[in-house]
Amino acid sequence: MKKLMVLGGARYALPVIKAAHELGIYVITCDYLPDNIAHKYSDQYCDISIIDKEKVLDAAQKLNIDGIMSFACDPGVVTAAYVAEQMGLPNVGPYESVCILQNKGKYREFLTENGFTVPTARSYQNVSEALKDIEVFHWPVISAAMCLALARRCRALLCWETIPWACR
């Protein structure tokens, strides 16, 4: 029987689990929240954080999976690509490409290096880094979280004094 590992256990995984079962596929859900709804419908559950790619890889190898995916669960996409590449499984793309596409800063850098027009943007790890670049931008600006899963945390900043607020 084929085995599919689904990263994440939220309700969004339910249609995938149902479709896999209809095809006779054994489904393993994986995340660190044992009460997530999808685990009740999968055949097996792994209590592992989906962003810990090495632990997910270890579990995937031990379970001898035939496929891995992260459906409607952005944090697991990079891990799914990593595991698929390490195990020679089909995937949406190479690990390096997926890493670029899942990180806004890396994606903008890729676009710029390849001649695409992109808005002026910078990536910062903390408030003090952002404050060093206040002269680079024309105010007001838009602040957004780097992780695609947090994209709804966009904020309009009218002046540089609001940077600490935006970085919360």
Q: Where is each model-derived feature located?
A:
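Active-site nucleotide/adenylate-binding loops and adjacent lid/helix of ATP-dependent enzymes
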Residues: 102-168
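ATP-binding N-terminal substructure of ATP-dependent carboxylate-amine bond-forming enzymes
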Residues: 1-97, 128
